Amino acid sequence: LGLGNIFAGNLDSALQAQLTLCKESPACKATMGDPRAELQAVLARLRANPVPVTYRDGSTGEEITETITADHVAGLVRMYAYMPAVGALLPQLIREASQGRYANLMALAKMMQGDLEESMSMGMQMSVICTEDAASMVVRAEDADTVLGNRMVESMASMCQAWPKG
């Protein structure tokens, strides 16, 4: 079983289930709208035009200005899928971003990115993926419109070309 192409579809299925809970709750829908539709709009907007955003660094409290991209959002959404309690913040973060307020989204994306960069799990993950699943890391048209799109598969396939096998 090659797992290379399951990331995008699985994330979209999990998001659909999670965000449908908000859409089906009158109180959540009244406050947050349709988080799935808003997420798609935010991603499309950021793919076309990444936006400079000033946010507060969660570790230092320092204000930093960087450009937020669709990849920041997709990466954050992907990791929140593994943390359902924290994932409850997604509708609020998506709502803010849909209104052009990206600071909280960027702060959390950068915090998550920093945590991942400091962990050893990426090396272990790539060792397994590159040994067992590299052949299944192919771009698929049906993943193009998902939250992750094909960027993750392209990135992992590229890393696997140089990754030691064994």
Language-model segment annotations:
Residues 38-166:
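Alpha/beta-hydrolase fold active-site neighborhood
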